[in-house]
Curated annotation (Swiss-Prot):
It comes from Mycolicibacterium smegmatis (strain ATCC 700084 / mc(2)155) (Mycobacterium smegmatis). PANTHER family: CATALASE-PEROXIDASE (PTHR30555:SF0), HYDROPEROXIDASE I, BIFUNCTIONAL CATALASE-PEROXIDASE (PTHR30555). Its cofactor is heme b. The record marks R103 as: Transition state stabilizer. This is Catalase-peroxidase 3. HAMAP family: Catal_peroxid. One of its GO terms (biological process) is hydrogen peroxide catabolic process.
Length: 744
């Protein structure tokens, strides 16, 4: 039996780790957390959309309006005062909180990963568990408390998310670093989300690597509870080259290339110090989530010495990188290449590096005692920039070109802190840079008159008469729009990047079949645009959506329930040169249960991947259910697979999927010739034994999972045909428009 959580209240953080404190363990975001021994149960809680009524700001609160009324100059002055006013309860190293606040913003934004777009600074998750209690985030709770007077003053005008990033910018600027810009627009969440942080059951454990350091997708950090990699080296081994391999993989999964990686590490470690005058396991109390009630959310109470200031204990590493730890300059790179380095133990017994033969003594100031000096200290991850051949070339180039280093750092910092915000039309405020970066997935502005209602009706008729089937039109529209990820607001139909590499060649999109549809739609588009030169035009992005909507309308009419499917216009077409192939490859679906597609290499079951994908599309459980059932009867399966097509009238938008799935006269058994995750099941007539239908795991989950079955029963009922069509159209319209943001 697991120990009671109460048993940990009076243990230090590291004592808790030593007894292998159990964390909630999942293999995917959609795996159950009930702990009752039902590992196949779906976690549908991730489909519970944030309810605006749970926000104390009310349903009608308009954050964009509030933020745009904010005086950023006044805010900057207030933050600067916080940064340079040391507090007795948590004294500032070197009299400046800049390095601490910079680390807070860095670790906040640095959780972002390209694999699923989760993490990042977008919703203020650093305030909640587990991030607020990550071992890598020790003492960042103090940084947030230092900013509370500022947050209190401005209230709803600035979210915690925006404030922490803006404060990080001001920290840099107050120490002499010119930043690239700042965009507001990050709205706070009011509770922790369901992000999957790894399979481990203990902090600082590593069960996410297999083979030769192959890191599980979609994770980026090398261990549970780290933001990046172990600063001592992989598995605490002080090997700079091995560390470089981990750094390169982790930063690549954060969306950073080698130049950006070197700039961020070298620039970040230009400031501040590490804190380890003694072993953290001997003096630190519980993390914020395990701290006693009277701590009011602060954790890691330190019993060593005064408990703060010169006696602050954070990681256990201990040292100062440069002679000017609160000033932007070239001192980190100068120091790194000025000495030969030997590995040594910190006072806490952790591996770090010092200049050989006592060199550098007396060159680094003490943060509190002006009469004391020290030698500089480096981490294994710092030495990686010197030892790795590719990093070394970049670092030496930066050393010889300070302006290039400063510009690369400023741009990389802006990318790090804004990468999860999505397209630039979501950015707010006067400090937004005018330059467009390719990682922002830019699309052209609308520079033409849009088609009107008569044009749309005529185009629908032409599309339906083009020889393209309902299945082809629906599948293409779905393939274009369903790439959207709510986590980082990437993907979607705007830009029509389904026409471009890499999307047009993704296996899930069946490139040869896709090319036929795109070619035929392009001919229709050209005819329309040529007939309206200088006037109304339609983009490929809009026409693809219009084709899907026309097909759904036709299918609904075929089922006896005619309905108008709305189609919002205003998308534009991105050129190939605005599309970074490697950057967009992160959006490629390894599975799409809505199309009954399962690629190779997926560890979670496909029904779990379905729920995860639905959460990225902001779908509720009923919306996910009605969409999948409708797409099955519309023939949207990958490769024309018959799995789950429970209808005698494919192409008609009927509720047949649910009616036949819940037919009590059908008995389901797995087919012996299929593998586990791609298993097929045969539905046999109980009386005759004849195979009536075949299904995938995903299909059967809508009758097996109790929640999904309850929803399916609604749509299988005799009075549900019209409701099914209405609900399908509503959910379809939602997905088609996810990337059309209202902000301008």
């Amino acid at each position: 039996m697991p120990e009671s959580p109460d048993a940990y209240v009076n243990r230090t953080y590291d004592q808790t780790v030593a007894v292998r404190r159990s964390l909630k363990r999942r293999n995917s975001p959609a795996a159950s957390e009930d702990g009752l021994g039902w590992p196949r149960r779906l976690n549908l809680r991730i489909l519970a959309q944030p309810c605006r009524t749970s926000s104390p700001l009310g349903e009608d609160f308009d954050y964009a309006k509030e933020f745009l009324s904010l005086d950023l100059d006044e805010l900057a002055r207030d933050i600067d005062e916080v940064l340079t006013t040391s507090q007795d309860w948590w004294p500032a190293d070197f009299g400046h909180y800049g390095p601490l606040v910079l680390r807070m913003a860095w670790h906040f934004a640095g959780t972002y990963r390209i694999g699923d777009g989760r993490g990042g600074a977008g919703a203020g998750m650093l305030r909640f568990a587990p991030l607020n209690s990550f071992p890598d985030n020790r003492n960042l709770d103090k940084a947030r408390r230092l900013l509370w007077p500022v947050k209190k003053k401005y209230g709803r005008k600035i979210s915690w998310s925006d404030l922490m990033i803006f404060a990080g910018n001001r920290a840099l600027e107050s120490m002499g670093c010119r930043t690239f810009g700042f965009a507001g627009g990050r709205e706070d969440a009011w509770e922790a989300d369901e992000t999957y942080w790894g399979p481990e059951s203990t902090w600082l454990a590593d069960e996410r690597h297999s083979g030769v350091r192959d890191l599980d997708q979609p994770l980026a950090a090398s261990e549970m509870g780290l933001i990046y990699v172990d600063p001592q080296g992989p598995a605490t081994l002080p090997d700079p080259l091995a560390s470089a391999r981990d750094i390169r993989e982790t930063f690549r999964r954060m969306g950073m290339n080698d130049e950006e990686t070197v700039a961020l590490i070298a620039g970040g470690h230009t400031f501040g110090k590490s804190h380890g005058p003694t072993d953290p396991s001997r003096c630190l109390g519980p993390e914020p989530e395990g701290a006693p009630l009277e701590a009011l959310g602060l954790g890691w109470v330190n019993s060593f010495g005064t408990g703060n200031g010169a006696d602050t204990v954070t990681s256990g590493l201990d040292g100062i990188w440069t002679a000017t730890p609160t000033k932007w300059d070239m001192s980190f790179l100068t120091t790194l290449f000025a000495y030969e380095w030997d590995v040594a133990l910190s006072p806490a017994g952790m591996w770090q590096w010092v200049p050989r033969n006592g060199a550098g003594a007396g060159t680094v100031p003490d943060p509190y005692d002006p009469s004391r000096t020290h030698a500089p200290t480096m981490l294994t991850t710092d030495l990686a920039l010197q030892e790795d051949p590719r990093y070394r070339v970049i670092a030496l180039r930066f050393l010889e070109n300070p302006d290039e280093f400063a510009d690369t750092f400023a741009r990389a910092w802006f990318k790090l802190t804004h990468i999860d915000m999505g397209p630039i039309q979501r950015y707010l405020g006067p400090l937004v840079p005018t330059e467009r970066m390719i990682w922002q997935d830019p699309v052209p502005h609308v520079d033409h008159e849009l088609a009107d209602a008569d044009d749309v009706a005529a185009l629908k008729r032409e599309i339906l008469g083009s020889g393209l089937s309902v299945s082809q039109l629906v599948t293409t529209a779905w393939a274009s729009a369903s790439t959207f990820r709510n986590s980082d607001k990437r993907g979607g139909a705007n830009g029509a990047r389904i026409r471009l590499e890499p999307q047009r060649s993704w296996a899930v999109n069946e490139p040869e079949k896709l090319a036929i549809v795109l070619d035929r739609l392009e001919r229709i588009r050209r005819r329309f645009n040529d007939s309206h030169r200088g006037g109304k035009q339609i983009s490929a992005a809009d026409l693809i959506m219009l084709g899907g909507c026309a097909a759904v309308e036709h299918a609904a009419a075929e089922a006896g329930h005619p309905i108008e499917v709305p189609c919002r216009l205003g998308r534009t077409d991105a050129p190939q040169e605005w599309t970074d192939i490697e950057w967009f490859s992160a959006l490629e679906p390894t599975a799409d249960a809505f199309r009954n597609y399962v690629g190779e290499g997926n560890r979670p079951p496909p029904e779990h991947l379905l729920v995860d994908r639905a959460s990225q599309l902001t779908l509720t459980a009923p919306q996910m259910t009605v969409l999948l059932g409708g797409l099955r009867v519309l023939g949207a399966n990958h490769g024309g697979s018959p799995l789950g097509v429970f209808t005698a009238s494919p192409g008609a938008l009927s509720n047949d999927f649910f009616v036949n799935l819940l037919d009590v006269n059908i008995e389901w058994t797995p087919r012996a010739d299929t593998a586990d995750w791609t298993a097929a099941y045969e539905g046999r007539d109980r009386r005759t034994g004849e195979v009536t239908w075949i299904a995938s795991r995903v299909d059967l989950s809508f009758a097996s999972d109790p929640v999904l079955r309850a929803i399916s029963e609604v749509y299988a009922s005799a009075d549900a045909e019209e409701k099914f069509v209405r609900d399908f159209v509503s959910a379809w319209d939602k997905v088609m428009n996810l990337d059309l943001f209202d902000r301008t």
